[in-house]
């Protein structure tokens, strides 16, 4: 499991990206690169990293479910994810 501080840091980045998205788009459109540089570093969407909602694991992230592969498998086997069942052929 990821440290709580890492999860919190990622949430903080997401809030900053959302807050400055409109301003960032306007500055980009105007070509004001100095203005862009004055914005906080973490307000750039490039700095976001997908993490598992339950464990905070940064690797093996399944975008469709918002979970890491480990948690996805566990929850799917328990039948906690609607519409997902084990393949058989």
From Swiss-Prot:
Location of the region described as Disordered in the Swiss-Prot/TrEMBL record: 32-51
Keyword rRNA-binding: yes
BP-aspect Gene Ontology terms: translation
One GO MF term attached to the UniProt entry: rRNA binding
Family annotation (InterPro entries): Ribosomal_uS14, Ribosomal_uS14_bac/plastid, Ribosomal_uS14_CS, Ribosomal_uS14_sf
Superkingdom of this protein's organism: Bacteria
Coiled-coil residue spans: none
Entry GO CC: cytoplasm; small ribosomal subunit
Keywords: Ribonucleoprotein, Ribosomal protein, RNA-binding, rRNA-binding
SUPFAM superfamilies named among the record's database cross-references: Glucocorticoid receptor-like (DNA-binding domain)
Function: Binds 16S rRNA, required for the assembly of 30S particles and may also be responsible for determining the conformation of the 16S rRNA at the A site.
Subunit field text: Part of the 30S ribosomal subunit. Contacts proteins S3 and S10.
NCBIfam families: PRK08881.1
Family designation: Belongs to the universal ribosomal protein uS14 family.
Name of the protein described by the UniProt record: Small ribosomal subunit protein uS14
Species in which this protein is naturally found: Christiangramia forsetii (strain DSM 17595 / CGMCC 1.15422 / KT0803) (Gramella forsetii)
């Amino acid at each position: 499991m990821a440290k709580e501080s890492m999860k919190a840091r990622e949430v903080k980045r997401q809030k900053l990206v959302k807050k400055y998205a409109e301003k960032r788009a306007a500055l980009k459109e105007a070509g004001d690169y100095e203005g862009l540089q004055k914005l906080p570093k973490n307000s750039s969407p490039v700095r976001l990293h997908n993490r598992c909602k339950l464990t905070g694991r940064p690797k093996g992230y399944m975008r469709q479910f918002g979970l890491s592969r480990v948690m996805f498998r566990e929850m799917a086997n328990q039948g906690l994810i609607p519409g997902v069942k084990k393949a058989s052929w």
